[in-house]
């Protein structure tokens, strides 16, 4: 007989060569393969179907052990969580103890809370609810917290409780990095970026609109008081223009009018009733104006020296962000983040409400001095900081300023040709204190122009005037104003720029200029895109500073871990100024101690 067997469930044989091999291996008679139906015919063969048995690894999630195992046995010895544990354990947190009460329920240990929050920030977990979830699910968080499980409210209260002391922890960490050779604190690369606030985008309050509406309201108040022909209204008026009225003055006038209406005789005639109703309407309108005036005064008080603020975050100022999807220059509420870095470690940071950079540099240097009781030897920044006030501060403080000015890059172009009619291109005689115009005429000094910055710094510019400019053949190219040409020159600023040009074009200056592009800019890129820190998550300047201080600590520890890992890959060959850190030695000793304890327990 003939047994009819399909190919697919038995063997995948696609050629006569495969059939021949099957015959030799199984000692089959010569089979016949139908070319049409692809069916294999075996004659006088009793075929046994054979299937391979799959063996899985043992799986028993309910398996118990005789001795409890260490939770960190599955955590690598060089894992960043161990670095966080070691760094926080070696920090002194005595200032945290005064934040807790002696009575009541025992709180969670501040070191455990600090480790959990910082490690959460290192893993892009900025929400207290996400950190709470990680403390229940992630083995790294569970080991770091020692099986403690604080809820999100407890984590949030801890962050708010230590919002003043967390800056001190950041300072201690940077000092430790300097002691271990990661940084030197001798050079600081400064730059800024705008970080959007948590406030909504369309909650703006503008100074110009507020002042304009307040002037209109004062005109309405003056017109209303002129309609009130009571003697006490004229006595309470503080000035003819009505600009000195306060909400309390208007409320006092309204109360006096109400009292006179109550104490007056009841109206009898229709005309008296109409007159009384008109007075009541005026009193009501006066109270409304008083409330509106109080609202405008409160807005101006919140504005301070700024031009805008957000209704939901009074400390946020509307600024133009780099992330402009519509490409229309739309302003959003945010903060100006100033940052100083070295070797891509954050040395110092500051949050400012002014969008401009020149006004923040001196305050930022004072913050550095307050943290480390010294100033950096060198400062590197872009042209946004190249003002006379900043140059003078750095020169008096003994800081070598590698700071660009406005047209530095334009001067460095290969085919740059200066304008022969600009004041910088004219010949200056320092002894006679005069300039020589392109036609050879002397431009004598006629006075000094003074201007004051928003910080109160006074700049002085010498004014020089030419003679007999009428009929000059170069007048059209020289200037277009009427009369003789007048120029203003800031000699002190020109001298600062000359020194900055010499530093920036030197060999060391070229090296610093090259590193500035990969120092703060790289930190901003890692912050916004690698760690997804593009927007603040709190309202108010104090909480925003607290949140970024936690982030800066987490960023520096994460950068330290990556630096240590890179050195380990390179075979431990470290530069002389960056020796093997003591943190790695501490971790190694700690791991050896833990392994010894576990071996003793097993024995």
Q: Model segments located where?
A:
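Anion-binding and metal-coordination hotspots
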Residues: 52, 58, 117, 124-137, ...
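Basic, short loop/linker segments at the boundary and entry of helix-turn-helix/winged-helix-like folds
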Residues: 76-118
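Extreme N-terminal basic, low-complexity initiation segments
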Residues: 2-7, 11
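Short, positively charged and aromatic/hydrophobic N-terminal segments
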Residues: 27, 34, 41-49, 588, ...
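Hydrophobic alpha-helical membrane-insertion signals
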Residues: 45-82
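Short hydrophobic targeting helices and cationic amphipathic motifs
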Residues: 12, 19-21, 28-29, 42, ...
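Serine residues within intrinsically disordered or low-complexity segments
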Residues: 14-15, 25, 598
């Amino acid at each position: 007989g003939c047994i009819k067997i399909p190919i697919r469930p038995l063997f995948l044989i696609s050629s006569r060569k495969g059939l021949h091999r099957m015959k030799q291996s199984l000692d089959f008679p010569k089979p016949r393969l139908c070319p049409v139906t692809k069916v294999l015919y075996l004659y006088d063969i009793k075929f046994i179907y054979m299937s391979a048995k799959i063996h899985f690894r043992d799986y028993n999630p309910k398996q118990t052990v005789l001795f409890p195992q260490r939770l960190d046995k599955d955590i690598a010895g060089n894992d960043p969580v161990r670095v966080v544990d070691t760094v926080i354990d070696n920090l002194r947190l005595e200032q945290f103890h005064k934040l807790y009460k002696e009575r009541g329920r025992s709180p969670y240990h501040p070191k455990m809370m600090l480790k959990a929050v910082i490690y959460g920030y290192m893993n892009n977990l900025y929400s207290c609810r996400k950190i709470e979830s990680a403390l229940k699910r992630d083995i790294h968080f569970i080991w770091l917290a020692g099986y403690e499980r604080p809820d999100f409210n407890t984590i949030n209260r801890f962050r708010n409780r230590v919002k003043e002391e967390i800056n001190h922890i950041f300072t201690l960490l940077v000092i430790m990095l300097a002691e271990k050779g990661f940084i030197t604190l001798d050079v600081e690369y400064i730059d800024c970026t705008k970080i959007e606030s948590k406030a909504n985008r369309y909650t703006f309050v503008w100074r110009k609109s507020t002042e304009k509406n307040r002037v209109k309201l004062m005109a309405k108040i003056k017109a209303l008081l002129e309609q009130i022909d009571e003697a006490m209204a004229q006595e309470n008026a503080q000035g003819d223009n009505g600009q000195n009225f306060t909400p309390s003055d208007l409320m006092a006038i309204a109360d006096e009018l109400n009292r006179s209406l109550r104490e007056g005789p009841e109206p009898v005639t229709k005309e008296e009733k109409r007159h009384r109703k008109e007075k009541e309407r005026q009193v009501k309108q006066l109270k409304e104006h008083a409330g509106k005036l109080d609202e405008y005064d409160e807005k101006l008080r919140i504005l301070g020296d700024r031009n805008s603020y957000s209704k939901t975050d009074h400390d946020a100022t509307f600024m133009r962000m780099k992330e402009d999807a519509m490409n229309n220059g739309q302003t959003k509420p945010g903060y100006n983040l100033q940052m100083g870095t070295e070797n891509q470690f954050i040395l110092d940071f500051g949050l400012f409400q002014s969008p401009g950079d020149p006004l923040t540099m001196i305050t930022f240097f004072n913050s550095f001095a307050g943290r480390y009781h010294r100033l950096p030897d060198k400062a590197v920044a872009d042209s946004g900081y190249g003002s006379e006030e900043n140059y003078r501060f750095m020169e008096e403080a003994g800081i070598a300023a590698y700071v660009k000015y406005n047209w530095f890059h334009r001067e460095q172009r290969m085919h740059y040709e200066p304008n022969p009619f600009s004041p910088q291109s004219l010949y200056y005689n320092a002894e006679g204190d005069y300039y020589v115009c392109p036609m050879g005429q002397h431009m004598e000094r006629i006075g000094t122009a003074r201007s004051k910055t928003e910080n109160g710094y006074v700049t002085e510019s010498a004014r020089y005037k030419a003679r007999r400019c009428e009929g000059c053949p170069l007048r059209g190219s020289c200037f277009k104003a009427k009369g003789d040409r007048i120029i203003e020159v800031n000699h002190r600023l020109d001298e600062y720029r000359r020194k900055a040009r010499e530093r920036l074009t030197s060999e060391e200056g070229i090296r610093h200029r090259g590193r500035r592009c990969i120092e703060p800019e790289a930190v901003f890129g890692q912050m916004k895109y690698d760690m997804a820190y593009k927007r603040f998550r709190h309202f108010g300047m104090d909480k925003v500073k607290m949140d970024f201080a936690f982030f800066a600590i987490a960023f520096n520890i994460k950068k330290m871990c990556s630096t240590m890992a890179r050195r380990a890959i390179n075979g431990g060959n470290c530069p002389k100024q960056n020796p093997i850190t003591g943190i790695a030695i501490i971790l190694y000793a700690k791991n050896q101690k833990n392994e010894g304890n576990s071996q003793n327990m097993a024995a």
